Amino acid sequence: MYIGPYQLSNNLIVAPMAGVTDRPFRTLCKYFGAGHAVSEMMTSDKTLRMSKKSLYRANFDGELAPISAQIAGSDPADLAEAARYQVANGAQIVDINMGCPAKKVCNKLAGSALLQDEDLVARILDTVVAAVDVPVTLTTRLGFLNGYDNILRVAKRAEEAGIAALALHGRTREDMYLNTARYDLIKEVKQLIRIPVVANGDIDSPEKAKYVLDYTGADAIMIGRAAQGRPWIFREIAHYLGTGEHL
């Protein structure tokens, strides 16, 4: 799989998780077979850019390429500036967070709360893509509320804006992490757009990884919670996908 000019070593990606996927954890996951990893989200609020937390999250020293920095916020201009800052800081890919379901993030109209305003989504996508000369990716969910899934429109608009790849968690914000991931909609998105689609949600075993890839036709899978305390899951999945056998 390619993200812009960058060919990943495989199609297994570490999902961005605030407070979890710091640089040491990303490095560990890559050591155990992940082909790519996305950073923890970093706020687009420039007044917080020099905080201890922000500086720690923006430390990519020694990280294996390609380096992907995720940004979060709701103002298109602020997000564009944050993207430029991360590129100057060493990021080779910028990821926009429209998937975080956390209350404190959504209360600021960031993360998955953005899915309530498709016009704002479009402005953010256009502005950030135009702001940097590196690939811009999007991480998102099916929609904000159950019964109001708007991911097909958002995915098409992302492709039109020049987004290089779309990572999709198969739940709405209302679902949080309850119910089951809806791979049927991920499959529809994959059939709708031509850019790479990354399937996310409930992938916790080699068998599940193969099923999701086969069923959705996704270009890659993204694993988050299942990698906590078990970063070698990437090696297990890669071996199973390549041989049909367990390590």
Give the positions of each predicted feature.
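Flavin-dependent oxidoreductase catalytic cores
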Residues: M1-L247
